């Protein structure tokens, strides 16, 4: 049923990556987040910068809130050329490019500065380029903060408190392994189904960053938010290669420059949103728990060990990131 609904929207808008309007090309950009989210604000910056650089010859029409489907569904639209640009989690991209898995290793990054030194340097750029063979070219990374646990009825103060709890995770093996290693029961589920799932007790909680916790209203059905900050999985701004290859060299430069500018602006939006989100959650009665992160890091060590055992070819990449 959802597939046909998405198909209907595509037919109604006549989506074919972009549309020629007089002297302008209109790029279609779809993502799953609400318009209050700092990532959406970053995308608005991308839109404004691109239109300014191109003097209106390249414009962007945005479809937020999952209007065109889940992250995976929108990626498929990019691959066939029906949508030009999207934003997805690096965890979702790991289903195509294995190197993205590494970015989700628990407690891999020592700090925010360390993370973006890696992402904006040689290592991060090389990962972005690897998606092209799947028709998904990476433009830049957006800050998605650090992910932490939140629950509806039982507080998580130590990893032992996760025992017996069903925790929603993305459909990503790294996230699944992490929750299971800490003692919880990882439950993959579409993000759009999560509010009702927590409300009805289908799952006991989930894990995400503060802005997503609040902008998706999950704070309304969760009593506890535990700032264990177990992973810092970035978002990725992508352009379909079917569209990219139709652009001139100058148009490609405009797109890349606009993306880079939006990434820097989005970091500011993100930091502002984290502060505001924590205040909103506290005001709503959510208990913010500051745990001993070392306990969670120790429990999750097996995730990295198992990952490099199964993917020895990733050992060099992991070591490069640690050495940055």
For every predicted segment, state its role:
Residues 1-26:
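Short, low-complexity disordered leader/linker segments with a strong preference
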Residues 18-114, 123, 131-324:
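N-terminal secretory/targeting leader peptides
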Residues 128:
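Thiol/selenol-based redox catalytic cores and closely related redox-interacting motifs
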């Amino acid at each position: 049923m959802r597939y046909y609904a998405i198909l209907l929207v595509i037919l109604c808008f006549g989506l074919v990556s972009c549309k020629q309007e007089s002297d302008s090309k209109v790029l279609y950009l779809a993502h799953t987040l609400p318009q209050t989210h700092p990532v959406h604000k970053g995308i608005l910056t991308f839109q404004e910068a691109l239109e300014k650089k191109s003097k209106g010859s390249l414009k962007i029409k945005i479809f937020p809130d999952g209007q065109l489907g889940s992250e995976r569904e929108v990626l498929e639209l990019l691959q066939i050329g029906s949508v030009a640009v999207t934003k997805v989690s690096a965890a979702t991209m790991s289903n195509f490019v294995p190197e993205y898995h590494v970015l989700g290793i628990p407690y891999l990054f020592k700090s925010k500065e360390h993370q973006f030194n890696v992402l904006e340097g040689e290592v991060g750029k090389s990962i972005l380029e690897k998606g092209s063979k799947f028709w998904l070219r990476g433009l830049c990374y957006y800050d998605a903060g650090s992910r932490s646990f939140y629950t509806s009825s039982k507080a998580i103060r130590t990893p032992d408190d996760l025992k017996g709890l069903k925790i929603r995770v993305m459909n990503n093996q790294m996230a699944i392994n992490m929750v299971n290693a800490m003692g919880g029961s990882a439950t993959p589920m579409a993000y759009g189904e999560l509010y009702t799932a927590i409300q009805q007790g289908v799952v006991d909680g989930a894990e995400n960053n503060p802005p997503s916790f609040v902008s998706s209203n999950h704070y309304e059905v969760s009593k506890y938010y535990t700032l264990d900050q177990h992973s810092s999985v970035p978002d990725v701004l992508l352009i379909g290669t079917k569209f990219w290859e139709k652009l001139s060299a100058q148009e490609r430069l405009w797109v890349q420059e606009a993306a880079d500018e939006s990434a820097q602006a989005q970091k500011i939006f993100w930091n502002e949103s984290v502060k505001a989100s924590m205040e909103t959650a506290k005001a709503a009665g959510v208990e913010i728990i500051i745990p001993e992160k070392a306990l969670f890091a120790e429990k999750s060590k097996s995730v990295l060990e198992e990952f490099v055992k199964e993917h020895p070819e990733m050992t060099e990449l992991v070591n490069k990131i640690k050495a940055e």
